[in-house]
Curated annotation (Swiss-Prot):
UniProt keyword annotation of ATP-binding present: no
InterPro entries: ERT1_acuK_gluconeogen_tf (IPR050335), PAS_13 (IPR056751), Zn2-C6_fun-type_DNA-bd_sf (IPR036864), Zn2Cys6_DnaBD (IPR001138)
Role played: Transcription factor which regulates nonfermentable carbon utilization. Activator of gluconeogenetic genes.
Organism (species): Sclerotinia sclerotiorum (strain ATCC 18683 / 1980 / Ss-1)
Any one GO BP annotation for this protein: cellular response to starvation
Name of the protein: Transcription activator of gluconeogenesis SS1G_02293
Chief location: nucleus
Composition bias type Acidic residues, residue spans: 1-12
Low complexity: compositionally biased ranges: 297-308, 337-351, 480-494
Amino acid sequence: MSGETEIDDPEVSDGASENDYSDHEQELDVVGKEDDNQEMAEQKVRPDGDENGNTVGAAATATKPKFDPKDPLRPRRKKARRACFACQRAHLTCGDERPCQRCIKRGLADACQDGVRKKAKYLHDAPPEALRPVLGPTYNQQVSNNRATAASTPTEPSTGMGNFFTQPDTSPSYPLFAANQQGQMPPPLQNRLSFGSNQPSPISPTFHTVGNRPAGMQGISLPQVSNDSHAAFGGGAFFDPSNPALFNFDLEGLNFGNHYGALEFGMLGHMASGSAETPPQDSSAGMPQNVGDLGYNNNPAFNNNPPFNQIYSHDALPDFAVAPPGAHRPAKRQDTKSGPSGKLGPSSALGKRNRDPSSIYDTVHEPYSYTTGFHSLTAFIQKRFSPNKTLRIAKSLASIRPSFISCTKTLNRQDLVFMEKCFQRTLFEYEDFMLNCCTPTLVCRRTGEIAAVNKEFTLLTGWRKEVLLGNEPNLNINTGNSGASSSGSSGRGSFTTPRMRPINLVDSNTASLNSTKILQD
């Protein structure tokens, strides 16, 4: 097409544009536009000349060649992501800006809008508002009559706070501040305001610090939040998926042709980055109504609102964190040599166990006797199962046991101790995984002994953790007699194995509901 064979020449381009569009032409005629395109192509390959038609300068000796449309080395023009309605009907090359340059020269700037595309088959179930084009940096939403009003906005900062998100007319507006409320924020809150930091937040994308605010917002520090905007934090209108500023990523940089794919990819990255935080259960606690009732004089700030003063007491806390400074959740388990300290670190605030794995290398001094474990397993199988099942188990064990024997044949005592330390160190990491996993899980050695178990497995089977790990005697393996398995027990052999009573269908449903409630707690 001729639109693709245009040459980036400012003189020829201006002449072609003036010849292409006239002021008196109002109808969009496809045939007429094709004639104009042919005339434009002829004019671009025509050499420069004076008024008499004589060639002048370097163009007299060399003429511009006409490029072959199939030539891969021909200069190409950057295509727009979506043409406007006028350029789409005329089959002309459009631009990303709105209004485009062709509509501006024709006087159709007010009517310049994106053309309608045919939906793909996989997008038939997508809503129409999710298929809007990605708004580029050159997108101009305001028409010419509103530009004069925006120029006078810096003198009155409060009048420019109505609609903060620059979205098309179809999207809802997001009023975040009351138009008639102004005030000067005290210095302590300016320095410790969490949703004014440089870190992106999925809940407060439009808050800025004093240094990086627009020109129309320099006079406003923290106005009182209106009731409508306060309800938007907990309502569904604020979390509009068509609003790109909600997720704090650049949709233009993702190079997607519509919001449907860009938002999905951006939200996946948003979740992967860990910036998605748990919203507060009570929206009124996250954003109090009496923000504007702060002390703006020489009196100390937050005299009448102690809970609000505690919100911004820590810079490291996430947005809308309302816990007091000493209300960190304690660690679930602390196995460090030194006792629990009075000041908890960031890891304890997140509920992670503050253990020291170096204790493994100090406590493990003997290798684990897998030979004794295999003999105990064989004796238990012969006593518990029938001869046919025992033979099948023995064949299965015989296929894997020679591999372990050949691996440990050349190892000395230090190697076996090192192997046990590696096992305990790996088990140290597995226990953290099992603590955060809701699936009933247990870790066994290759000889069958249980090395670790999580809480969900004990709830499922009815066995306590001490019995499963062999710390307390039972009637299965650790009977309380002398041996390696009962070395850590109390020595009493009167403990009985717990028996699960048979239950009917109603009791099973009740038990499943109770176990689900326990897991949720």
